[in-house]
From Swiss-Prot:
Residues annotated as binding Mn(2+) 1: D226, H290, E319, E333
Keywords: Hydrolase, Manganese, Metal-binding
Cofactor: Mn(2+)
Residues that coordinate or bind Mn(2+) 2: D215, D226, E333
Designated name of the protein: Uncharacterized peptidase SH1217
PANTHER family given in the database record: AMINOPEPTIDASE (PTHR46112), DIPEPTIDASE YKVY-RELATED (PTHR46112:SF10)
Organism: Staphylococcus haemolyticus (strain JCSC1435)
Amino acid sequence: MSKIEKITKQLQHEQADAAWITTPLNVFYFTGYRSEPHERLFALLITANGDQTLYCPKMEVEEVKNSPFEGKIIGYLDTENPFEIDPLSFNKLLIESEHLTVKRQRELTQNFGVQHYGDIDQTIKELRNIKNESEIENIREAAKLADKCIEIGTEFLKVGVTEREVVNHIENEIKKFGVSEMSFDTMVLFGDHAASPHGTPGERKLVKDEYVLFDLGVIYNHYCSDMTRTVKFGTPSEEAQTIYNIVLEAETNAIEAIRAGVPLQDIDKIARDIISDAGYGDYFPHRLGHGLGLEEHEYQDVSSTNSNLLEAGMVITIEPGIYVPNVAGVRIEDDILVTENGYEILTHYDK
């Protein structure tokens, strides 16, 4: 069943007339056309019989025509009301309620005469959760480039270099490999600064005998990677090395349990129990991982409260961590493709 067929099936189930999709990444997912419209209306309308209409600024119409999208295009000028170009009326509309603004919903009510609304968010999340071969290949390439970023960063380490200098070096050098965008702000943290899980790289200078945490990702053909490595610079303290070994054991055991049909919460529990049994449970304050795809954080999460089952075609991260103030912060993260009988690790830089 195609993506559009799954949407129309949901529309029929909800007795809705159409779905209205406005999140740029979701529109891209269904159309193959990517836009950053800012304040302008950019939306995909999918009716219960499968008809598709893309609303976009008139200046983008030619680009849409050159994209994979084969539906109707309504291009509008900034001075026009796009809803008046082809007046429509719907009794019930499914919307992305997690994203659509109140202002935009009022426009739908006024212009389409919508009487009832429902949610399409979960259906789209579940569609994006299972990747096809093309998506997997894009993520695989993004993961290779993330590996290269870690290599670039570790080779640049030297006494006196700052966190920010390492970040800048990674992002400048990776452009030579065709990368134009990172998945998120690159994180490089030295020593106990890494005890802040979402710390901001700054002017801290590297000294001998501490760990360096890299957390980064690359976008390749619209798809993200997201990996973390904590690498030695010299010989860190005994406690810091103990923490590292515990985190590595937790990650290794969690990954080895991955296969289709296993509850996500079971994977989280494996890693969390290892860290807790070692006495560091209070220093592991986040879920074990999350989905990965067009965004660096996607449905589903790998957490103690998620009883949903792993499915073949999912791509998730596994990223246990221990963060002890004034001692060390260690996190190790890999991107994992779930298969019917196990898993494939997509990120490969040494641990």
